[in-house]
Design a protein with these regions (language model features):
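Long, hydrophobic, amphipathic alpha-helical segments used as structural scaffolds
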Residues: 1, 20-28, 70-74, 94
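Short, hydrophobic, well-ordered secondary-structure elements
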Residues: 1-21
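Short amphipathic alpha-helical leader/targeting segments
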Residues: 14, 26, 77-80
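Short amphipathic alpha-helical segments, especially helix-boundary/capping motifs
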Residues: 14-16, 37-41, 60-63
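Short, charged amphipathic alpha-helical segments flanked by flexible coils
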Residues: 21-51
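Charge-enriched, short contiguous segments at helix-coil
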Residues: 47-94
Length: 94
């Protein structure tokens, strides 16, 4: 159930980044913003630094692997990285 775990992490990350943008009064222009859209907004408004921005990009890539790429199977290590990264985002980005 690696793909399902990755998809859930993606939803959690996206919701958290959306809430962070709301707290900082940052509005997304897209109707349905993605993790990457929120990540760009947070970077542009100096809420996250470059290292954090890159880490979020990596986690978004792992989430996309789980949701979209049927020819590439996520590994246990990929999902463990995604779960740990999700936990870190929730604890460190406000």
């Amino acid at each position: 159930f690696y793909r399902a775990a990755g998809a859930i992490c993606g939803v959690v990350i996206e919701k958290h980044l959306s809430e962070v943008c709301t707290q900082h009064q940052i509005k997304a222009t897209k109707k349905n913003p993605t993790i990457n859209d929120y990540n760009e907004l947070l970077k542009a408004n100096n809420i996250v630094d470059i290292a954090t921005w890159r880490n979020i990009q990596r986690l978004a890539d792992l989430r996309n692997m789980c949701d979209h790429h049927k020819d590439i199977e996520p590994t246990k290590d990929n999902i463990e990285e995604l779960i740990a990264g999700t936990d870190k985002i929730l604890k460190t980005i406000f």
